[in-house]
Amino acid sequence: MPFFYVPGVGLSTLEQKLTEMITAPVEALGYELVGIEFIRGRTSTLRIYIDSEDGITVDDCADVSHQVSSVLDVEDPITVAYNLEVSSPGLDRPLFTAEHYARYTGEEVTLVLRMAVQNRRKWQGIIKAVDGEMITVAVDGKDEVFALSNIQRANLVPQF
């Protein structure tokens, strides 16, 4: 199961440490750290999402990967074997912070909840508002309110 970086919401010690270590090198290269996922498994994966006003290229990802790898090699915060992936958020951009939800107000989103609300864990609708640690999503014409701490995963729905 993936672990997501959401400032102030359920961060483990490892995720806090990774965020602290990764943010400065990413920002020093001129990119925004959108979020991180640490997916535990047979071969674990540390996935880093970056963005910039000009978009992200493969070369940008390679630069960030090289810089972050150097930091992780020295600090060695992860005790299991893992793969490092650096990518843009893509069309189905994951949302990690309240600021991300606010930035994409009016956009369609898919949410997967940690705990079911009205016997449902998966929801899809339009982001209407963000109020502190709560978001309002219009689902089938009705406003539903979700706590950010209950959102396991959120992605924008690409519009073609």
UniProtKB/Swiss-Prot annotation:
Where do the coiled-coil regions begin and end? none
* Origin superkingdom: Bacteria
Which Pfam families does the UniProt entry name for this protein?
DUF150_C, RimP_N
**Cellular localization per UniProt:** Cytoplasm
Q: Which CDD domains match?
A: YlxS_C
Record bears the keyword Disulfide bond: no
GO process terms (BP): ribosomal small subunit assembly; translation
Q: Name one GO cellular component term.
A: cytosol
Q: Which UniProt keywords apply?
A: Cytoplasm, Ribosome biogenesis
What family is this? Belongs to the RimP family.
What's the stated role of this polypeptide?
Answer: Required for maturation of 30S ribosomal subunits.
Q: What is this protein called?
A: Ribosome maturation factor RimP
Q: Which gene encodes it?
A: rimP
